[in-house]
């Protein structure tokens, strides 16, 4: 899949009220675009081929409600493509921050670690716990105010 939006993808986004897609990144299975909703607020839209993994990510995203994880907005399919819309957070991923600045101060590291620990605790203490299996600097987004967000979707804990 190319970084630019195809005509069909642009049409599908527009039909659901999202405009001005701008490529912001990619993972193993999806590309992520920043889009504007009807209120002109930014949202993140993950576009990928519809697979069981994509369907599971949509279900998981709907269930998780914690400040460390992007808020679910909606999802839909259009042919072979799936669209998952979530809250968009401006900021920088921790990997880029470390590459630019070098190591974090002890205070910065402690604040980030505390937020991540609270989010992981939330996942593990749910009635149906989730595991976050992709914890790495590239998946930790840091805002200017120091708050964090974990990207990628947690998975239900194997029983």
Language model regions located:
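AlphaC helix of the protein kinase catalytic domain
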Residues: 94-104
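ATP-binding glycine-rich loop module of kinase domains
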Residues: 31, 35-51
């Amino acid at each position: 899949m190319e970084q630019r939006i195809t005509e069909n993808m642009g049409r599908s986004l527009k039909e659901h009220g999202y405009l001005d897609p701008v490529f912001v990144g990619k993972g193993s299975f999806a590309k992520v675009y920043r889009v504007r909703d009807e209120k002109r607020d930014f949202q993140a839209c993950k576009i990928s081929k519809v697979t069981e993994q994509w369907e599971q990510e949509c279900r998981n995203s709907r269930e998780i409600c914690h400040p460390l994880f992007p808020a679910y907005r909606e999802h839909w399919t259009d042919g072979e493509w799936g669209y998952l819309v979530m809250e968009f957070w401006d900021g920088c991923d921790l990997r880029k921050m470390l590459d630019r600045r070098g190591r974090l101060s002890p205070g910065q590291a402690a604040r980030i670690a505390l937020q991540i620990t609270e989010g992981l605790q939330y996942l593990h203490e749910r009635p149906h716990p989730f595991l976050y299996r992709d914890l790495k600097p590239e998946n930790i987004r840091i805002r200017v105010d120091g708050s964090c967000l974990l990207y990628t979707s947690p998975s239900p804990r194997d029983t």
